Amino acid sequence: MTGASPRWLLLAFFLALGYLVIGPPGRVPDEPGHFWHAQAIARGHFAPASRHAVDLYPLPSGMSTIFWVMRAEGHRLSPKDYEIAASIPHEPYGLRQTSTFPTHYTPLAYIPQTAVALLARAAGMKPFHEVYLGRIVNLLTALGLIALAMRAAPRYSTLILATALLPMTLYELASWSADAPAIGLGLLFCAFMLEPPEPTPRMMAAVAATALLLSLSKPAYFLVALLALFRPTPRRITVAAIAATAIGIPIAMAYANYAWYNARPGFVVDPDAQLRCIVAEPLRFAKVLWNDLRNNAANYGEELIGRFGWLDVYLPKAIVGLEGLLLVACGLTAAPALDARRRMAAIAIVVATFFGIVLSQYLTWSIVCAEWVDGVQGRYFLPILPIALAALALPSPRWRVGPRTVAVVAVVANAFGYVALVRSYY
């Protein structure tokens, strides 16, 4: 059985359109902040005025008002709410100082969103319509990258398709979130590492560009490049992947270090103080990591598959279990299986990336010296999911999960996702 054709992503597009239409503006995690950050970038504002300062930028007040109208808190949304939101002009009360969180992402994480912001500003588009145009463009950009991933690694394309059709993936793709292009870039880079291309100048440039953009967008996934150290990766592809990652990571980290600020006023959050706490008591921190894994692993898995709204809209447990079983089955029956060295490397990369993400959230989002970790969400692991699944592959599976099975489960799971959103917001 061959892998999945990129044409299966037409299903992903139509399923994502359902979330785009049903999901109210601003009800995807951090969507207002991503929207405002792209608007600030489109106006030439790329970083805070000073290190660790709250990144405020004067944006038209209508860009805040629409999210207040569509807040869906304490009441059910009605057509009247949408009518009011659609009528809001850019500047009903002039400019308003707006916090452009999450400012610690570099502007390269917002290329499609910034393009929409520039176009909408030139056309005089109202904020409400701009939100939906940006969602569509972000979705198409991410799906384009995922299609390239499926073409780059046809033997692992079913794993990529299964990741792309997850309710959580589609919900993120159909939003202004920087996660949308990052997921696309992450899956494309995983594809290059799982099924290395021939070292032609074109493919070397493609691998290097993908590694660089991913590093500058979401540096948490830099360890994926280490798969290039193992055969059958051609030496020049290895150099392209490692060198581009090595260039991008220091830039992204320097930007994040400068632009970070405490987005939790009232809580003592300080990365430098947190790091000193870790160094002073490493065994205590190891216990924090272990407790987080023990207590929250199931929760992260559920969020990976589908947790909507501001993490307050749930899929039925049975649907989460069905998707989980599908992912495991896709991984176990993937072919060809990784050889022993690449399998061990893949497992090490996934484990290290998991703990690296937990560490980053402990440093930048958790209270200093806390006994728990705040801020980790299961969706953060979507870009490396194909590598995790490929590491499960049996040496000689008697059968393989095909794209039709993946598609059927996706239709069922996302239908339940639509129902959950409608019941929560309308």
Enumerate the language-model features and the residues they cover:
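Interfacial juxtamembrane loops and adjacent helix segments
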Residues: 45-133
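Membrane-interface helix-loop-helix junctions at transmembrane boundaries of multi-pass membrane enzymes
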Residues: 2-3, 156, 200, 235-240, ...
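Specific aromatic-rich, kink-prone transmembrane helix
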Residues: 147-148, 183-198, 210, 387-388
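Membrane-interface alpha helices of multi-pass inner-membrane proteins
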Residues: 170-171, 202-219, 223-230
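Perimembrane helix-loop-helix junctions
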Residues: 192-202, 222-248
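Transmembrane-helix signature of polytopic, membrane-embedded enzymes
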Residues: 3, 123-128, 149-167
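Membrane-lumen/periplasm interface segments of multi-pass, membrane-embedded glycan/lipid transferases
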Residues: 254-337
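Short acidic/glycine- and proline-prone juxtamembrane loop motifs at membrane-interface regions
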Residues: 175-182
